[in-house]
């Protein structure tokens, strides 16, 4: 059976109080609307149409890479009107259409599959996704017939006293037979106080036409929508719990899951240990046997096997196996750190390559540089890469020893097996095997202090 989907993503989200369209707010590193699209795709629904409205271009820009189509809702005239705007998408199709909202990122592919199968197996023309909650106040109630099929949906304000006791609510997600939906949409009107077209009225139309309507009850958290920053935080907490549980099941030790923040696209291999306060974002990959001590942030980076990181920031970079980083190191984008390297405290690396077995132990800046293997950077070494207009490159060969408080003024090359004396400012090439000394000769003025005090 052919299945397609319509995704409602045209709402303004005024309660978010944000210039960003509501559906583009991120949950664990991914836009809410893209969470739903990805769940639909995992449920084998490839043909997805996204309804966009105000700030349509922003939503299109963030979703078009997922090969979806778009329909436009220029005026916000209700959920039924939004689906009416997608009629062109539905015309000529036979099968079923799932309708979901772009602000409900917790929906899973498993639930979507179950909904579609339940709808088709029972021969329903429409199926509502519902939840049963202890406090249904404010939600539309689902009334069922004796055979379990849906009789109608009643909004909270229209419920009678007995109907208010019903705890099954409409989750605002549906599956329809496409032809039955198109026929119902043609009969949909806006004869109500708000002058809007409601998708819930389609259920009433189907029932009047003698069509079968079913309901599938699922866990409430999967259907949670986001209309405020508070709800966004609640949804993020649930998603984070899911993500951390997945990593725990896959053999990762997370010392305190409630205080560990891992984006949905992060990959962590088994036998790694994550301490509290770590933030892993983007497409970061943590290989086997790594230890992330508390309070590091790693973004879009690849961390190879057996790396130890403490209290550091790593952005868009690669860290080789058996390397240690931190505490308080800053690895900036486009850096490649080799294997068995030591990047110590208060070290900043920017757009540089550091060779295997090199040690940069403390208080050092390396920018726009190529550093070879088995080098040692003394405390306070600075690569002076910026002349006020342009960045320049520094090349340091293999087996180079740089003393404390040295400056390498770019562009400059320090060749293999050479030494730089402490306190030197290097502006010219250092030959292979040479000792470079670039500092003033020490002068001791005898009795200088006594003479100063006598003045």
Curated annotation (Swiss-Prot):
Binding note for cofactor: Binds 1 Mg(2+) ion per subunit.
- Per the record, GO CC terms? cytoplasm; membrane
Pathway of this protein? Nucleotide-sugar biosynthesis; UDP-N-acetyl-alpha-D-glucosamine biosynthesis; N-acetyl-alpha-D-glucosamine 1-phosphate from alpha-D-glucosamine 6-phosphate (route II): step 2/2; Nucleotide-sugar biosynthesis; UDP-N-acetyl-alpha-D-glucosamine biosynthesis; UDP-N-acetyl-alpha-D-glucosamine from N-acetyl-alpha-D-glucosamine 1-phosphate: step 1/1; Bacterial outer membrane biogenesis; LPS lipid A biosynthesis
**One Pfam family it belongs to:** NTP_transferase
What are the recorded GO MF terms, alphabetically?
Answer: glucosamine-1-phosphate N-acetyltransferase activity; magnesium ion binding; UDP-N-acetylglucosamine diphosphorylase activity
Q: Which reaction does it catalyse?
A: alpha-D-glucosamine 1-phosphate + acetyl-CoA = N-acetyl-alpha-D-glucosamine 1-phosphate + CoA + H(+); N-acetyl-alpha-D-glucosamine 1-phosphate + UTP + H(+) = UDP-N-acetyl-alpha-D-glucosamine + diphosphate
Highest taxon of source? Bacteria
Q: Where in the cell is it found?
A: Cytoplasm
- Region of interest: N-acetyltransferase: 251-455
Q: Where is this region: Pyrophosphorylase?
A: 1-229
Q: Where does UDP-N-acetyl-alpha-D-glucosamine bind?
A: 8-11, 22, 73, 78-79, 140, 155, 170, 227, 332, 350, 365, 376
Q: Which family does it belong to?
A: In the N-terminal section; belongs to the N-acetylglucosamine-1-phosphate uridyltransferase family. In the C-terminal section; belongs to the transferase hexapeptide repeat family.
Protein's job = Catalyzes the last two sequential reactions in the de novo biosynthetic pathway for UDP-N-acetylglucosamine (UDP-GlcNAc). The C-terminal domain catalyzes the transfer of acetyl group from acetyl coenzyme A to glucosamine-1-phosphate (GlcN-1-P) to produce N-acetylglucosamine-1-phosphate (GlcNAc-1-P), which is converted into UDP-GlcNAc by the transfer of uridine 5-monophosphate (from uridine 5-triphosphate), a reaction catalyzed by the N-terminal domain.
Q: What is this protein called?
A: Bifunctional protein GlmU
